[in-house]
Amino acid sequence: MSEINQKVVDIIVDKLAVAPAEVTLEANLANDLGADSLDIVELILEFERVFDINIPEDQAEHIKTVGQVVEYLEKRLAEK
């Protein structure tokens, strides 16, 4: 597991109070992990803070799964 992946899992476990085993790359933040719209906004804000990036709203709305979060962050951090 990459460092980015581990940080994403840790953030999701903390914010959504789910078991780490539930946070798979295929897990949908809303449908599988129970995040509501406010939870998702809080997750995005925490990803921005931890990874020191800005995630535009038009891009954030396309991020639905844990795998998409990791993929997006890896791409953005590689651009820095």
Swiss-Prot record:
4'-phosphopantetheine is transferred from CoA to a specific serine of apo-ACP by AcpS. This modification is essential for activity because fatty acids are bound in thioester linkage to the sulfhydryl of the prosthetic group. SUPFAM superfamilies: ACP-like (SSF47336). One of its GO terms (biological process) is lipid A biosynthetic process. Pathway: Lipid metabolism; fatty acid biosynthesis. InterPro entries: ACP, ACP-like_sf, PP-bd_ACP. The keyword Protease does not apply. The modification O-(pantetheine 4'-phosphoryl)serine is found at S37. It comes from the Bacteria. One of its GO terms (cellular component) is cytosol. Keywords: Cytoplasm, Fatty acid biosynthesis, Fatty acid metabolism, Lipid biosynthesis, Lipid metabolism, Phosphopantetheine, Phosphoprotein. Residues 2-77 form the Carrier domain. Belongs to the acyl carrier protein (ACP) family. Carrier of the growing fatty acid chain in fatty acid biosynthesis. This is Acyl carrier protein. It comes from Amoebophilus asiaticus (strain 5a2).
